[in-house]
Amino acid sequence: MIKAPQRSGRASEVVRFLRHQCSEVIETHFAWIFLTDLHAYKLKKPVRRGRMDYTTIAARKQVCLDELTLNRRLAPTVYLEVLPITRSRDGILAFGRRRGTRVVDWVVKMRRLPAARMLDRAIAERTLRKQDVQSLVSMLTGFFDGAVRQQLSEPRYVERLLERTDRNRRDLCAPELGLDARCISRIIEMQMAFLEERKALVRPRAAHLIDGHGDLRPEHIYLGSASDSPSVIDCLEFDSELRWVDPAEEIAFLALECRKLGAGPLAHALVAQYRASTLTPPSAALMDFYTSQSAMTRAKLAAWHVRDPELARDAALWRTRASRYLSIAARYIRRASRHLEAASTPRTQPSASTGQRCSNGASGFPDNIRRIASPNSGATESTVSFPAQSGGSGPKW
């Protein structure tokens, strides 16, 4: 649960000041985003959640600076500066420091991106082009190749994945979430078995860990234009541990979210082009394992909304969303095992019914495994085709 004080007079005053400067306001769990025609200003909320604590002005300044630095890696022309909001002696709020003023808060100033060129919108409106996919993969592989690397031993990497998998079991099986504990436990058992029995596939990936993005979703990806390069916004700035990833896991996560929007062939193209662009491509089985793990992460994030008192009336919706991700996790860990069966006889035979047992509410989830595995022949066309889907909100700012 997010712990936040009642909005103080100072916070309310800062919000009112920013509202007067802007034409549109977006509120998230952790921030307000104030939009003008050309810019966006992000103000962190004074909230506390786990290791994340934004309850002091100094903490909010630091996380703004971190957000600026980290996001400039993939969006150097989008993240412009960190600005102080100051109060004069006569009580007037303004941007920037001047003599006799006192800092009351900090904001990240960004260039506003056109919503029509965000990946989720392009998927929804069927405007995605082949060159968009190629440019995106090229940008991401360049980022992966140049990113800071983490030194981690092969046994420790496997151990860390096992710890994460077990933590998912504990978190998702919490009784108050109301999810199918038997289904969750079976998925976890299959993921654990994969890690224990297929260490030869997993261990070498320890050499590829980078300080990555951590939240590579379609709504965070700007496809660029004739005069503007692609960018990726909104990395996980508040927890470096969550950003230490195998690039293959980042691609698997993005592909999962594209499938959620009905863009199975796009997901296939992203994975195929990434594997073709790297000197050490991950196996198909490992990509499916990472997809299963990513789906568990998304299920957990959806389920956590059930605990939020402000979202109590939407608890059934979030439970359904979590269950759909659990269904996807089950399908992909089964598929990872089938890849291995084709190469050798596995030591354990996963239950063929796991996907069905975990498919509560999954019929409405736009994820067609056969179509993803065998995309249509339109790959030679100038556009990427996939079923029309409603939605596509563009960026959060």
Predicted regions and their residues:
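Walker A (P-loop) phosphate-binding motif
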Residues: 337-353, 366
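ATP/Mg2+ or Mg2+-diphosphate-binding catalytic cores
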Residues: 300-342
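Short, surface-exposed amphipathic charged segments that create phosphate/polyanion-binding patches used
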Residues: 96-97, 348, 379
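Low-acidity, Ser/Thr- and Arg-rich intrinsically disordered low-complexity segments
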Residues: 351-359, 363-365, 370-385, 390-393, ...
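Short, compositionally biased leader-like segments
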Residues: 1-10
